[in-house]
């Protein structure tokens, strides 16, 4: 019984540590503000994916959402952007879909599968946000060619959309790999005899 209690306590502490990690990184997600060419390079998608995959219950969705909303409340006014604007709402919807991808692979101990989920999440985010921009922006022709323009080169006078996809993809892969490895290490059971954790699978 004591061994079971020890494992339950260890799992609870691991979840609290991961929650703290998600909050800290979420609150620092706008690091490249002074470098427009690195727009969308952020840990946000990795946070939602891994929260869905590794957190349980109330914490699983409130942790990343709070981290995102707090930073948006602080930063968005400097851009003149409201949290209730349609594009912000579709962005939050995209985050929640990435969270559901994480839920779908919850329980996995494969780092490769987590990274694969991150790649899928980055593609979902790009297609949803750029597709929505195509729908509401009169600068895009409402045709197949206009949709392709929104997904690739974007609106003239602005950075190309493929640059956003590149940054989203690269940052999501990096943060998913690093944070996923940390999450797997935190969840490893500790042997009561050796005091050491077993090694997580990376395949």
Which role fits each region the language model picked out?
Residues 2-62:
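Hydrophobic transmembrane alpha-helices
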């Amino acid at each position: 019984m004591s061994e079971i209690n020890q494992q339950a306590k260890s799992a609870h502490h691991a979840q609290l540590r991961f929650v703290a990690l998600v909050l800290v990184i979420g609150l620092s997600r706008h690091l490249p503000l002074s470098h427009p060419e690195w727009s969308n390079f952020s840990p946000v998608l990795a946070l939602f994916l891994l929260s869905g995959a590794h957190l349980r219950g109330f914490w699983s969705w409130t942790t990343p959402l709070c981290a995102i909303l707090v930073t948006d409340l602080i930063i968005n006014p400097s851009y003149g952007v409201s949290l209730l604007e349609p594009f912000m709402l579709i962005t939050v919807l995209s985050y929640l879909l990435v969270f559901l991808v994480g839920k779908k692979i919850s329980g996995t101990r494969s780092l490769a599968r987590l990274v694969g989920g991150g790649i899928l999440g980055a593609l979902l985010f790009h297609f949803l946000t750029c597709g929505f921009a195509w729908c509401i922006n009169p600068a895009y022709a409402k045709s197949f060619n206009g949709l392709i323009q929104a997904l690739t080169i974007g609106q003239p006078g602005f950075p190309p959309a493929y640059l956003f996809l590149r940054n989203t993809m690269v940052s999501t892969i990096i943060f998913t790999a690093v944070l996923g490895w940390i999450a797997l290490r935190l969840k490893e059971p500790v042997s009561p005899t050796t005091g050491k954790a077993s090694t997580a699978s990376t395949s």
